[in-house]
Swiss-Prot record:
The gene is GNRHR. Residues 1-36, 91-105, 169-199, 290-298 are extracellular. Disulfide bonds join 104-183. GO terms for cellular component: plasma membrane. The chain crosses the membrane at residues 37-57, 70-90, 106-126, 148-168, 200-220, 269-289, 299-319. One of its GO terms (biological process) is cellular response to hormone stimulus. It comes from Octopus vulgaris (Common octopus). InterPro entries: GPCR_Rhodpsn, GPCR_Rhodpsn_7TM. Glycans are attached at residues 5, 11, 15. This is Gonadotropin-releasing hormone receptor. Residues 377-407 are annotated as: Disordered. Its main location: membrane.
Length: 407
C-alpha cells in the first residue's frame, strides 16, 4: 500500500459548496528521498536474487532441500522487488494512479502475494531445519516434505491475497488542478478496516513469527542436549572398535556439521525477517487500531520491511563465500586431503596413521604389544572399513602383535 499517496488523497475532505477546491498531491522532496532509497533497495535486490537463482540452477545433480527453499525464497523476493518496490517507485514518480481500475486490483493482489510467499518460504526454511536437527534419521523423507511445504506456501499465498483484489479499487476526487485518480481501499466502515488489518497481521507476521521462534528454540535445545550427551558419554575401552568410531562418531559428526552450517544460515535469514518487519507491524497496528495519523512514519518502516528482500541474497552469498573460502583454506593446509587412520584395540590402546593421498607417504605411530583390529578413514565416512595396508590385523591368542604374518 502506498500510504503517502493514500493518506494525502484520503485526508483532503472538503465541502464543495462552501470551500474552494484543494491542491492535488504533488511531487516534492519526500518523494525524492523515497525514490532514492527504494531505487537502491530495488537494484541490490534484483541483482542479488537473480545471481542466487543462477547459482542454484548451475548446481549439478539434485539440489538439497535448503537449496530448493533458497531458490523459492529468491523468486519470492524478486516478486516483492517488482510488485512492491518497483511499483512504488513508479507510483511515487507519477504521484497519481494512472493504470486504471483493473491494474489497480491486479497489482494490489500481486503486492500481497509476494509478501505472503516470501514469509511462508522463510517459515518453511525454519521448519526444514527443525526437522533436520530433531529427526536426522528421516533424511530420506526431507525432499518430499520440502516439496509439500513449498506447494502449500504458493497455494496459501494465492488464497490469502484474494481479499486485497476485492478491497482495493481506483477512486477519483476533484482537485483544483482537475480530477485526481488513486488506487486505494474501499472500506464502508472502520470495523472492516480493522478486521482486514488484524487478519493480515496474524497471517503475515504473528503466526509465522511463532512458528519460526518455536522451531529455533527446539533446534537450540536439541543441539545443547546432543552436545552434552557427546561430551558426557564415556568410551568403553573393552568394546570399542574402529568400525564403531567410523560409523558411530565420525559419520554423525560430519552430518552434524553440515546440518549446523545450513541451520546457521537459515537462522540469520529468519532473524533478518524479524528485524526488518517487526517495527513496521508495530506501527501498522497503531495505524489501523489507534488511528495514528503519521503516514510518513509508516512509509519509512514499510521500506525497512521490504528491504528484507535485499538482505536475503546477501546472506546467502556471504555464507557461500565463507564456505568456499574455508574450503580453500583447508586445501591450502592439506592440498590433497589428509587421511587420518584410527586403529583401536580391545584394551583401548590406539595408533594413528596419517597419510598424504597425493604423495602416498605416511607415518605410523605404534605402541609395542598393541592389538590392531581395523582402521577407518576420516575423510570418507562411507568407505567400507578394512585393515590398514601393510599392517596385519590378525592377533595372537595372547593379544600381542605377531612377529610375522601367519602361514
Amino acid at each position: 500500500m502506498d500510504y503517502l499517496n493514500d493518506s494525502m488523497f484520503n485526508n483532503m475532505t472538503y465541502n464543495i459548496t462552501s470551500t474552494p477546491l484543494p491542491d492535488a498531491p504533488r511531487f516534492d522532496n519526500v518523494y525524492v528521498s523515497k525514490l532514492c532509497v527504494l531505487g537502491t533497495v530495488f537494484v541490490i535486490s534484483f541483482f542479488g536474487n537473480t545471481l542466487v537463482i543462477i547459482q542454484i540452477f548451475r548446481i549439478r545433480g539434485s539440489r538439497s532441500t535448503i537449496q530448493s527453499l533458497i531458490l523459492n525464497l529468491a523468486i519470492a523476493d524478486l516478486m516483492v522487488s517488482f510488485f512492491n518496490i518497483l511499483m512504488d517507485i513508479i507510483w511515487s514518480a507519477t504521484v497519481e494512479w494512472l493504470a486504471g481500475n483493473t491494474m489497480c486490483k491486479i497489482m494490489k493482489y500481486l503486492t500481497v502475494f509476494g509478501l505472503h510467499l516470501s514469509t511462508y518460504i522463510t517459515v518453511s526454511i525454519a521448519l526444514d531445519r527443525c526437522f533436520a536437527i530433531l529427526s536426522p534419521m528421516s533424511r530420506s523423507k526431507a525432499p518430499l516434505r520440502v516439496r509439500i511445504m513449498i506447494t502449500m506456501a504458493w497455494v496459501l499465498s494465492a488464497i490469502f491475497s484474494i481479499p486485497q483484489a476485492v478491497i482495493f479499487q481506483e477512486q477519483r476526487k476533484m482537485f483544483r488542478q482537475g480530477m485526481f485518480h488513486q488506487c486505494r481501499d474501499s472500506y464502508n466502515a472502520l470495523w472492516q478496516k480493522q478486521l482486514y488489518s488484524a487478519s493480515s497481521l496474524i497471517l503475515l507476521f504473528v503466526i509465522p513469527l511463532i512458528i519460526m521462534v518455536t522451531s529455533y528454540l527446539l533446534i537450540l535445545k536439541t543441539i545443547v542436549k546432543t552436545s552434552r550427551q557427546f561430551h558426557d558419554t564415556p568410551i568403553s575401552p573393552t568394546s570399542m572398535s574402529c568400525y564403531s568410531v567410523n560409523h558411530g562418531q565420525i559419520r554423525t559428526h560430519l552430518f552434524e556439521r553440515a546440518r549446523k552450517r545450513s541451520s546457521r544460515m537459515s537462522a540469520v535469514i529468519v532473524a533478518a525477517f524479524i528485524l526488518c518487519w517487526t517495527p513496521y507491524y508495530i506501527i501498522f497496528l497503531g495505524f489501523a487500531f489507534f488511528q495514528w495519523d503519521n503516514s510518513r512514519t509508516v512509509i519509512y518502516f514499510f521500506t525497512l520491511g521490504t528491504s528484507n528482500c535485499m538482505l536475503n541474497p546477501l546472506i546467502y552469498g556471504a555464507f557461500t563465500i565463507y564456505k568456499v573460502h574455508r574450503g580453500r583454506s583447508g586445501s591450502a593446509n592439506s592440498p590433497s586431503g589428509t587421511r587420518l587412520m584410527i586403529m583401536v584395540n580391545k584394551r583401548g590402546r590406539s595408533t594413528t596413521t596419517t597419510t598424504n593421498r597425493m604423495s602416498g607417504s605416511g607415518r605410523r605411530q605404534l605402541t609395542t604389544g598393541q592389538t590392531i583390529t581395523q582402521c577407518a578413514s576420516l575423510t570418507n565416512p562411507h568407505q567400507p572399513v578394512r585393515p590398514s595396508p601393510g599392517i596385519n590385523s590378525t592377533t595372537s591368542p595372547n593379544g600381542k602383535m605377531p612377529t610375522k604374518p601367519p602361514g
